[in-house]
Amino acid sequence: MVLSIQTNKNVGSITQIIGPVIDAAFAPGQLPNIYNALVIKGTNQAGQEVAVTCEVQQLLGDHCVRAVAMNATDGLMRGMNIVDTGKPLTVPVGKVTLGRIFNVLGEPVDGLEAVDSKESLPIHRKAPAFVDLDTKLAIFETGIKVVDLLAPYRRGGKIGLFGGAGVGKTVLIMELINNIAKAHGGVSVFGGVGERTREGNDLYMEMKESGVIQEKNMSASKVALVYGQMNEPPGARMRVGLTALTMAEYFRDINKQDVLLFIDNIFRFVQAGSEVSALLGRMPSAVGYQPTLATEMGGLQERITSTKDGSITSIQAVYVPADDLTDPAPATTFAHLDATTVLSRGLASKGIYPAVDPLDSTSTMLQPWIVGEEHYSCAQNVKETLQRYKELQDIIAILGLDELSEEDRKVVARARKIERFLSQPFFVAEVFTGSPGKYVSLKETIQGFNKILTGELDDLPEQAFYLVGTLDEAVAKAATL
């Protein structure tokens, strides 16, 4: 965090410490504002240096405030000095953040040199006013066939990413980061909220390997990473999403770019808020969640939007506790989503990547008056064919293909081609697959699927459609088989 403490220091003293919650007393008339950052620097009884930053959450009366710590409170004692910085937590923003890993305070944690940032912004900011919003509905083309055709993303929208372990979430995220940089000249910000440290490290290593982060030329990197992992105090996990969002807002508002904001995992943001709420002594609401759940979620989500300057499109991994979609945490998240991308283990086990489930994934953008009649009818026909194939699978398993009618056999053959054509080679997976990545425009995607549906390509083998970009590549591949 960029800490320029005001010259006339407002110093209080710690009166109580309960885990990550700190109470502090200040002189009459000198109480810090809600959300102000407080800093404790001193030496503990073992003679070790301690430095803790916290954020004011409540004004208790009797010249006391209650704050939540952003770091571990080990070694703090009653009576220690606590300094009001006079402003909220402030983090570095701009091009210098690209290729780097930050914590909730905006401090680099990747072991590289300090960030020399001339620009910094507070993490608590108002959402853009309605007059500044770009309310035009526009598709955000990703270059990934299955997404653009069946569950298109909205520019400045929010997308939920559902999928268990090992079905290709990370690779899909990295491909989106790569494609937004190439096709839209945009950048990405990744907020790791309350997930495993190992996963954060793996993502960083894979990004370096695939060229999304370029160590030799950091400014050519396409992403900034902000981590507040599982082992961090709840205060840090609750605020790390806002730190990532603040960095993304700068790219949108000042650099006027299209930004992709990844939040992994939005459920952990709610979970951290619930822990903080209990620590602050608030009465719990349904299922033990915080009473302010909808307000906290709204405060974060309303800042993620398109303005006349640029857009922030957010992709949020959603963990569903005990697979219960009615749980207040996922239910509150769903209210904000424009599209869902569901990854399927069944498709992944068949080797079809990206393993996006074409029937489970949805989008509010898939309406004829938004995407146009041609796109809409093509998407509906693809879904219809795949659904019919799904219904016939039991019959095929028991009696075999020969027992189907001529019409149904055609449907099955086309559905299998569609299923394979929905796969495509990724740029970021080139190092693993050996196949060069492909960015497929929406126009080419629609043309390709229309030709499969009309039966023009019934004589081509289904293997020709596997892991190719456009239809021309499938035809060329068929000639070599």
From Swiss-Prot:
Listed InterPro entries: AAA+_ATPase, ATP-synt_VA_C, ATP_synth_F1_bsu, ATPase_a/bsu_AS, ATPase_alpha/beta_chains, ATPase_F1/V1/A1_a/bsu_N, ATPase_F1/V1/A1_a/bsu_N_sf, ATPase_F1/V1/A1_a/bsu_nucl-bd
UniProt-listed Pfam families: ATP-synt_ab, ATP-synt_ab_N, ATP-synt_VA_C
Oligomeric and partner information: F-type ATPases have 2 components, CF(1) - the catalytic core - and CF(0) - the membrane proton channel. CF(1) has five subunits: alpha(3), beta(3), gamma(1), delta(1), epsilon(1). CF(0) has four main subunits: a(1), b(1), b'(1) and c(9-12).
PROSITE patterns given in the database record: ATPASE_ALPHA_BETA
GO molecular function, one term: proton-transporting ATP synthase activity, rotational mechanism
CDD domains: ATP-synt_F1_beta_C, ATP-synt_F1_beta_N, F1-ATPase_beta_CD
Task of the protein: Produces ATP from ADP in the presence of a proton gradient across the membrane. The catalytic sites are hosted primarily by the beta subunits.
Assigned GO CC terms: chloroplast thylakoid membrane; mitochondrion; proton-transporting ATP synthase complex
Name of the protein this chain belongs to: ATP synthase subunit beta, chloroplastic
Organism: Tupiella akineta (Green alga)
Catalytic activity: ATP + H2O + 4 H(+)(in) = ADP + phosphate + 5 H(+)(out)
UniProt entry keywords in alphabetical sequence: ATP synthesis, ATP-binding, CF(1), Chloroplast, Hydrogen ion transport, Ion transport, Membrane, Nucleotide-binding, Plastid, Thylakoid, Translocase, Transport
Residues in coiled coil: none
